[in-house]
Regions:
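Active-site-lining helix/loop region of Rossmann-like oxidoreductase modules
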Residues: 3-134
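C-terminal active-site/capping subdomain that shapes the small-molecule cofactor and substrate pocket
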Residues: 98-203
Length: 203
């Protein structure tokens, strides 16, 4: 999830200076490994057959047709380990030890690819048009952003593909010098160690 988020933020950070991040991630069950995939499949099958004897070994609640705001262990302060990992890893990769970050990580009944809703505030003013230009030459990310024609990233668009997709780019209505955006990527492909190294090399 961190890598997918960073892919959406780094092109903008390099030009406008990242100041703070508010994010909500919608994480596929493949983030829990094969066991998560099987649990979702088993629950969907059971419910389609009218059975209520759902297996719940991986997640504390039914994941089929549900969302669970609980990814990894809860820590002191009410944040999960995954949420704190996003904060700490994001600061480390971007080399911004004082970056203000808050996030909520949610497990969703999608097999593959994580999605992240991000509000990012910058040191310098930035327009939607300037953001699009910043993404143009950045490797590994592609803009899909024409909401009027129902064009925006979805998990299915990125499954088993290397590129992350960004869309719903708009100026935030609350924070100054801020953009809201939607980033989606196959965490298995983009979240691999190789891609983490590639991102570090681009900073």
């Amino acid at each position: 999830t961190t890598i997918v988020t960073i892919m959406g933020l780094n092109p903008l950070h390099r030009k406008f200076g990242l100041k703070s991040v508010i994010a909500s991630s919608y994480q596929a069950v493949s983030g829990s490994g094969q066991a998560g995939i099987m649990e979702l499949s088993d629950q969907i099958r059971a419910l389609s057959e009218g059975r209520n004897d759902l297996t719940k070994n991986v997640y504390p609640h039914q994941i089929a047709f549900n969302v669970i705001p609980h990814v990894d262990q809860f820590m002191d302060g009410g944040y999960t380990r995954e949420e704190l990992k996003m904060l700490n890893e994001g600061r480390k990769i971007l080399e911004l030890p004082d970056l203000q970050v808050t996030c909520t990580c949610v497990r969703v009944p999608v097999y593959r690819s994580h999605s992240v809703s991000v509000t990012a505030q910058f040191e310098s003013p930035v327009s939607v048009e300037e953001a699009r230009v910043a993404y143009e030459d950045y490797p590994g990310i592609r803009v899909v952003d024409d909401p009027g024609n129902a064009l925006y990233p979805t998990p299915l668009d990125t499954t088993e593909k290397d590129d992350c997709l960004v869309g719903r780019i708009r100026e935030d209505m609350v924070l100054e010098n801020a953009l809201a955006l939607w980033v989606v990527g196959d965490q298995i492909r983009k979240g691999a160690a190789l891609n983490a190294v590639q991102i570090a090399e681009l900073l």
